[in-house]
């Protein structure tokens, strides 16, 4: 069973509380998503493997540690997931970036996939699927389905806020993946939005309705 973890770092929680505010501007919202993603990227990458290498400092030769060549991929669920990409890339700039595009049918609340663009060697990579919200779980499940169909096996899902309903659905559908969030919120409302949540992350990121 994959693990579920709420990352409760004080800086993350402080920034998340500002992110949730109705009066937070588009500019500030975008910057906060980026900052929280970077802080979460630090936490979720703790188990990346290291190897020892010999290097030359200005003083002497020494054996130090570096990432052991593990290939990484960041896969945002469009469109809101785009807001989290740069935060991760600031930590691992050599990572490849894939894209999975979805929109939510407003009547059925089910996700509809319209784009899958991934690195050719996605099956060899440690994948971080990023989306600010894990609400009903439908988009996350469909994204992981798409990745697994292409041979991906090492997948982590990273979000800013999650509803219990979405967490359970994702765990039931894909019990092998790890799920990380900055907050496990109360519930979903009748419209499928997280309560208290932060509104529509895509609209708030891009200033649209």
From Swiss-Prot:
GO biological process per UniProt = UMP salvage; uracil salvage
Q: Which PANTHER family did the record assign?
A: ADENINE PHOSPHORIBOSYLTRANSFERASE, URACIL PHOSPHORIBOSYLTRANSFERASE, CHLOROPLASTIC
Under the heading InterPro entries, the entry gives: PRibTrfase_dom (IPR000836), PRTase-like (IPR029057), Upp_B (IPR034332), UPRTase/APRTase (IPR050054), Ura_phspho_trans (IPR005765)
Q: Which Pfam families match?
A: UPRTase
What Gene3D superfamilies does the entry give? 3.40.50.2020
Q: SUPFAM superfamilies annotated for this entry?
A: PRTase-like (SSF53271)
Q: What class of enzyme is it?
A: transferase
Keyword GTP-binding applies: yes
Q: What is this protein called?
A: Uracil phosphoribosyltransferase
Q: Which family does it belong to?
A: Belongs to the UPRTase family.
GO terms for MF: GTP binding; magnesium ion binding; uracil phosphoribosyltransferase activity
Q: What does the entry list as the binding residues for uracil?
A: 194, 199-201
Report whether Magnesium shows up as a keyword of the record. yes
Organism source for this protein? Answer: Streptococcus salivarius
- Sorted alphabetically, which keywords does the UniProt record give? Allosteric enzyme, Glycosyltransferase, GTP-binding, Magnesium, Nucleotide-binding, Transferase
Superkingdom, taxonomy of origin: Bacteria
Cofactor, how bound (note): Binds 1 Mg(2+) ion per subunit. The magnesium is bound as Mg-PRPP.
Query: Which annotated residues bind 5-phospho-alpha-D-ribose 1-diphosphate?
Result: 79, 104, 131-139, 200
What reaction does this enzyme carry out catalytically?
A: UMP + diphosphate = 5-phospho-alpha-D-ribose 1-diphosphate + uracil
This protein's pathway: Pyrimidine metabolism; UMP biosynthesis via salvage pathway; UMP from uracil: step 1/1
């Amino acid at each position: 069973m994959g693990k579920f973890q709420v990352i409760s770092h004080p800086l993350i929680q402080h920034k998340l509380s500002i992110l949730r505010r109705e009066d937070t501007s588009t500019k500030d919202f975008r910057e906060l998503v980026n900052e929280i993603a970077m802080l979460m990227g630090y936490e979720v990458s703790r188990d990346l493997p290291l190897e020892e290498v010999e290097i030359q400092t200005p003083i002497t030769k020494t054996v130090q540690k570096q990432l052991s060549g593990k290939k990484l991929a960041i896969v945002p669920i469009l469109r809101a997931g785009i807001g989290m990409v740069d935060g991760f890339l600031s930590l691992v700039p050599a990572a490849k970036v894939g894209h999975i595009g979805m929109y939510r049918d407003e009547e059925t609340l089910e996700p509809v996939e319209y784009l899958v663009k991934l690195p050719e060697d996605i099956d060899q990579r440690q994948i971080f699927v990023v989306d600010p919200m894990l609400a009903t779980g439908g988009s996350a499940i469909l994204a992981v389905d798409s990745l697994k169909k292409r041979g991906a096996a090492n997948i982590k899902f990273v979000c800013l806020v999650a509803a219990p309903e979405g967490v359970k659905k994702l765990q039931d559908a894909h019990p092998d993946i790890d799920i990380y969030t900055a907050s496990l919120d109360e519930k979903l409302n009748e419209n499928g939005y997280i309560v208290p949540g932060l509104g529509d992350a895509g609209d708030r990121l891009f200033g649209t309705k």
